[in-house]
Amino acid sequence: MNAEQQYIDLFSQTEAMICQHSTEVMNTPRATAFADFERLGFPTRKQEKYKYTDVSKFFEPDYGLNLNRLDIPVNPYEVFKCDVPNMSTSLYFVVNDAFYNKALPAPHLPDGVIFGSLKEMAAKHPELVKKYYGKLADTSKDGVTAFNTAFAQDGVLLYIPKNVALERPIQLVNILRGDVNFLVNRRVLIVLEDGAQARMLVCDHAMDAVNFLATQVIEVFVGENAVFDLYELEETHTSTVRISNMYVKQEANSNVLLNGMTLHNGTSRNTTEVLLAGEGAEINFCGMAIADKNQHVDNNTSIDHAVPNCTSNELFKYVLDDQSVGAFAGLVLVRPDAQHTNSQQTNRNLCATREARMYTQPQLEIYADDVKCSHGATVGQLDENALFYMRQRGIPAREARLLLMFAFVNEVIDTIRLDALKDRLHLLVEKRFRGELNKCQGCAICK
């Protein structure tokens, strides 16, 4: 039995159970998503978008799923302690694919802000969730998005009303927890109305040393003049596979910063599609990956300049050691009416060994003539002249290598607009390069 068939059979047998433990808003598109999954199947290397990562093979093993929504015997508020100096956040948890709401802290959110379980919030605010859920994540075009939509039962909703600004960042910690190999399907819906402002930090952790497979679909709507910063920090273990699809839509004069940082993982496959739908919208999109052993990190991005006078800046950097593999494919599309577009895309990569492999594919599609667009990609090794220069001045060879690698990724870290997080990332990256880090030293949740 192939991977698709086992999940087709599973859905057919358990559809009623899946719907029973979810909500009407999430159940409504479920049948269509399942039909799309039956038609599309899991992506393979035969598809251009997935040619650097064979996603289908990760679904072949047997995984446990919590379709009955059984309680997880862990209180994350008792075992998690984020001690990043000078960083004050509103802290929340998702355990596997369920929002943890049994010991919520005292709310620090302004009036009108909605944050919590997607399932519960959809029951309380059905028209709001219905307006946005599934409107960016097109199940007819991507097998993973279709699969996630068919099986997801809960998730997270963040809604910020017009002209409301969150003073404190929201910190969402995704915890993978299981005694057997486990599959989770996470869903995130983020809506900022016109003039709203928010910052969000999402941290991925795995508590147990079993095989985890996590699919994730994130939809982000950013209204006119709204400002949103989203930081994703992945620190799981080498038996974890994460397949994440993010869809972002920006209206006029909105400003978004996306920063995805992979410090430790097994396999990460991240797709991000950004639609600049209103004039004056700006996206600053950064990513960093540090990989060693047989780790694999693949980022596939697209930025659609659909209207005039928009700006996009994209910067991705990889440092690959041992036999690790990295991939970056980035498309910038400038449509015929999108005059006065300003776009810059850069991908720089450092292979610390001859065995490490990096695939890079920057792309520009420009159908307007009054634009300023550039792209570039480099793959190289450490600068031998710089190493020689540093050793001549008494710096040991290993220390010189570490200094050069740290300087290489520092440009991405410096885009972070939370000073406390930026300072902690400098420390974590240094420890990662020294081989001293396989989990966040700023918390006590991972084994």
Label the model's feature ranges.
Residues 1-217, 227:
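Short, low-to-moderate order helix/coil transition modules at the start of elongated helical scaffolds
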Residues 124-388, 392-395, 409, 413-447:
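Conserved beta-strand/loop scaffold segments within soluble protein domains that form the structured core
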